[in-house]
Amino acid sequence: MIFQRTVKEMVKTTGVGLHSGNKVTLTIKPAPVNTGIKLVRTDLSPAVEIPAVADQVRETTMCTALVNDDGVRISTIEHLFAALAGLGIDNAVIEVDAPEIPIMDGSASPFVFLLQSVGIQEQSAAKKYIKITKPIRVEDGDKWAELKPFKGFRVDFAIDFNHPEIARSQQHMVMDFSSSAFIKDISRARTFGFMRDIEYLRANNLALGGSMENAVVLDEYRVLNPDGLRYEDEFVKHKILDAFGDLYVAGHAIVGEFCAFKTGHALNNQLVRAMLAQQDAWEIVSFEKEADAPVSFSVPAGAVFA
């Protein structure tokens, strides 16, 4: 049987909030089977819990933010959620002492390292997957995103930026998902932004913590980071990373194909909401044998059962 997963023990790190510029402490704790991913604001009294579900995503400007009915928010969840999805972690409690997840280096790689360093524990209940049975599509002008039936999890993603450096890179990628492929090919891709936008963002109290330490920065012609890019196609790979994280608020790993053109956080969330609303387009499945599982998650080293 393919089992649910959590972290073996509590792990903690600190970083900077991308938009606030303030120090943030992030704590990840184990959780029982069928808990899902829960986020908690520990800087509030009493602490406020926000479930990581699609209808709690109420802000998608520059990041994905969960916001409850009282306006309490936790922003910039997408890179952490990509790491959780990529490592197949079903259950965890995420605590932060600020309104956003720390940006770290702008990719999912520090979160992958954090989760792998503390260890991943298989649990005693079957892992649940969302199996797509009919196509679901959302559009916004020339942008679109779609989920289609497929035996594994495949991403077919294209971007279209009118910038010479991005235009020179590969702007279309197709990949079949596995934990190893995610860690090797996607997790290190950093968020990117343009110098021309920084003044506007900071005037609106956004990207106050942004720097070349946690983003790829471009002027009108080139990448400004002294060390350049981590991948030749880092731009499209980061958009895929964002999509991994955004789709994980569906609650489970998806068995299907995700196809997208120029999509971002808003359209990704619209797609998840459209899928959940179209209940005849998917079903919850589990797999008795690992060989039958269409989505390949690396078996945790020294896995134990809880």
From Swiss-Prot:
Its cofactor is Zn(2+). One of its GO terms (molecular function) is metal ion binding. It catalyses: a UDP-3-O-[(3R)-3-hydroxyacyl]-N-acetyl-alpha-D-glucosamine + H2O = a UDP-3-O-[(3R)-3-hydroxyacyl]-alpha-D-glucosamine + acetate. GO terms for cellular component: membrane. SUPFAM superfamilies: Ribosomal protein S5 domain 2-like (SSF54211). It comes from the Bacteria. The active site is at H265. Pathway: Glycolipid biosynthesis; lipid IV(A) biosynthesis; lipid IV(A) from (3R)-3-hydroxytetradecanoyl-[acyl-carrier-protein] and UDP-N-acetyl-alpha-D-glucosamine: step 2/6. One of its GO terms (biological process) is lipid A biosynthetic process. It is an enzyme of class 3 (hydrolase). Zn(2+) binds at H79, H238, D242. Belongs to the LpxC family. Catalyzes the hydrolysis of UDP-3-O-myristoyl-N-acetylglucosamine to form UDP-3-O-myristoylglucosamine and acetate, the committed step in lipid A biosynthesis. This is UDP-3-O-acyl-N-acetylglucosamine deacetylase. The lineage of its organism: Bacteria, Pseudomonadati, Pseudomonadota, Gammaproteobacteria, Alteromonadales.
